[in-house]
């Protein structure tokens, strides 16, 4: 009976230790993806979108004219692709 209690205690202690170790390693790993994503999606001045004289797809067309290949939606006031069913 004592042997069974000791083995259950050791098993439980081992599971607790495994949980603590995995939690510690996971908390360290959580910072890595955040740092990696922030470096990937960092906005660089060379890659910023240039200001256009026309509005592109799904851009507001109240003040600007739509770029070639797009028309201003009369309902939503966005630049959309022209289609036969749109008036």
From Swiss-Prot:
Highest taxon of source: Eukaryota
Chief localization: secreted
Tissue: Expressed by the venom gland.
Gene Ontology molecular-function annotations: ion channel inhibitor activity; toxin activity
Cellular compartments per GO CC: extracellular region
Signal peptide positions on this chain: 1-24
InterPro entries: Huwentoxin-1, Huwentoxin_CS1
PROSITE patterns (UniProt xref): HWTX_1 (PS60021)
Entry's localization field: Secreted
Keywords (A to Z) from UniProt: Disulfide bond, Ion channel impairing toxin, Knottin, Secreted, Signal, Toxin
Bridged cysteine pairs (disulfide): 54-67, 61-72, 66-79
Annotated propeptide span(s): 25-52
Domains as described in the record: The presence of a 'disulfide through disulfide knot' structurally defines this protein as a knottin.
Family classification: Belongs to the neurotoxin 10 (Hwtx-1) family. 51 (Hntx-8) subfamily. Hntx-8 sub-subfamily.
Stated role: Ion channel inhibitor.
Protein name, as recorded: U3-theraphotoxin-Hhn1a 7
């Amino acid at each position: 009976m004592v042997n069974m209690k000791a083995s259950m205690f050791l098993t439980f202690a081992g599971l607790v230790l495994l949980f603590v170790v995995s939690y510690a390693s996971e908390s360290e790993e959580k910072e890595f993806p955040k740092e990696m994503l922030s470096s990937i999606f960092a906005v660089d001045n060379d890659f910023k979108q240039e200001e256009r004289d026309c509005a592109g797809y799904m851009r507001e067309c109240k003040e600007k004219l739509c770029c070639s290949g797009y028309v201003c939606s009369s309902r939503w006031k966005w630049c959309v692709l022209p289609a036969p069913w749109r008036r």
